[in-house]
Amino acid sequence: MAQFDLTRINCQYLDRHLTFPLLEFLCGKEIYNQQDLLEYILDTVNKTNMIDYTMDTRKRLNLSQDMPDELVQRKSDVLATLKQLQNEVAPIMKATDILKNGESMKDSKTFVNALQKDYNFKVEHLESAYKLAKYLYECGNYQESTSYLYFCLIVMSPNDKNYLNVLWGKLAAEILTLNWNTALEDLTRLRDYIDSANFSTIQALQQRTWLIHWSVLVFFNHPKGRDLIIEMFLYKPLYLNAIQTMCPHIMRYLATAVVINRTRRNALKDLIKVIQQESYTYRDPITEFLECLYVNFDFEGARLKLHECQTVILNDFFIVACLNEFVEDARLMIFETFCRIHQCITISMLADKLNMKPNEAECWIVNLIRNARLNAKIDSKLGHVVMGTQPLSPYQQLVEKIDSLSMRSEHLAGLIERKSKQKNQESADSWKYY
C-alpha cells in the first residue's frame, strides 16, 4: 500500500539519524524494492560518521568485497578526530561525570561558578563540549552525546548561538536511546523555547512543523502521549495551524490517538471538524473511516475502511504498535454509533458490520458490556442487543467545556500578541522618518 505510505514525506522533517529506524522498518515490509531501500540507506548513512553502519549496509548490498580504501581511511580519521575532541574537553570531564550521576546543581549560575572555581572552566571548554556532543551524535554514540548536550544546556545561556541546536540534538539523542520520559521533558522545553522565541512568522512555522513530526515519535511511545498529542495538535491553535498549513498528513496520527483514547471521546467532535476542513488536502483510510462513521453514518463504508486501516497501520512505523488497540476501539465506535441510531439490533447484523462471526460478535459484546459498563442487554433467544440511554457524565461535560474554552483562550491570546507585534512594528517604522 505504497499510496498511503508517509515515510518519504515524514523523513523530510526528521533529522537524518531519526530516519534510519523508519527506513529499516520499511526493509521488513514489501512496499518498496529492497535494493532501492538499501541504496537509499547507504546514501544517507554516508553523510554521517557511522562508518560501521556504512560497512554493514554495503554487505547487505553485496558490496563488501569491494570495500573502498577511502572508507577504511575515513574510519581512522573519525577516530582520530574523536580523540582530539575528547582531549580538548578533558579538563571538564569530571564535571560531566557528576552530571551523569545525577549530582548536578539545579541553579545553572551556581554550577557555572563551581566549574570556574574547581575546574578552571573557560568559554572555550563549552564550545569544545558542544563540538564533541555533535560529533558523538554523528558517530551514532547517542548515549554519550546526551551527557555533553545536557552539560551544554546547564551551562549555556538561552541567547547562545548554539542553544537551539543543543535543544534539538538533545531531543533527537533521547529519542534514539528510547529514553521516553527524558525525551518528553526535552520536547516540552523545546516547545516552550520555540513559542517564546523572537522568530519570524515563517521561521516559527518551520520550527513547529519539525517539532510536530519529532513529537509523534515521543507521543506514541510515552504512557501520557495519547493525551498530550491531542492537547498539542488539536487544542493548541499555533500547532493546529501548522498542521493545516504545512503537514495535513499528520491528521493520521491525531486521528489514531483519538480513536485509541477512550477517555478523550469528547475530542471526536472537534477532530471531525478539522478532518472535514482538510479533506480536500489530505485523506487516508483512517480519516475516511471517521468520516464514514460520524459524518455520513455509512456503516458499510466504515467497515471497509477499517479493513484498509489495518493495512495502513501495519506499514506505518509511528503507529504499528497500536494496531490491535485501534481495531478494538474502532469496532467499539461502530458498535456504539450503530446502537445509538438503531437502539435494538440483531447480533448477526452487528457481526456483519464488525467483520466478525455471530458467535464471536456475541462474546465480544458480552465482554464489552461487562468491562466498559455499557447500558445494554443481550437477548440470546431472539439474538438482539438492546441499548439503554448513555447520558454524558458531568465529568465528560466539564472536560469538553474546558477544552473548548482553552482553545478559544489560546486563539484570542494569539490574536492579541500578533496585533501587539504589528502595532510595535508600525511604531518603530514611523521613527525611520525622523
UniProtKB/Swiss-Prot annotation:
This is Eukaryotic translation initiation factor 3 subunit E. One of its GO terms (biological process) is formation of cytoplasmic translation initiation complex. Belongs to the eIF-3 subunit E family. It comes from the Eukaryota. It comes from Drosophila grimshawi. The lineage of its organism: Eukaryota, Metazoa, Ecdysozoa, Arthropoda, Hexapoda. PANTHER family: EUKARYOTIC TRANSLATION INITIATION FACTOR 3 SUBUNIT E (PTHR10317). One of its GO terms (cellular component) is eukaryotic 43S preinitiation complex. The gene is eIF3-S6. Component of the eukaryotic translation initiation factor 3 (eIF-3) complex, which is involved in protein synthesis of a specialized repertoire of mRNAs and, together with other initiation factors, stimulates binding of mRNA and methionyl-tRNAi to the 40S ribosome. The eIF-3 complex specifically targets and initiates translation of a subset of mRNAs involved in cell proliferation. It holds the Pfam family eIF3_N. Component of the eukaryotic translation initiation factor 3 (eIF-3) complex. The eIF-3 complex interacts with pix. Interacts with mxt. It is found in: Cytoplasm. InterPro entries: eIF3e (IPR016650), eIF3e_N (IPR019010), PCI_dom (IPR000717), WH_DNA-bd_sf (IPR036390). GO terms for molecular function: translation initiation factor activity. Residues 219-392 form the PCI domain.
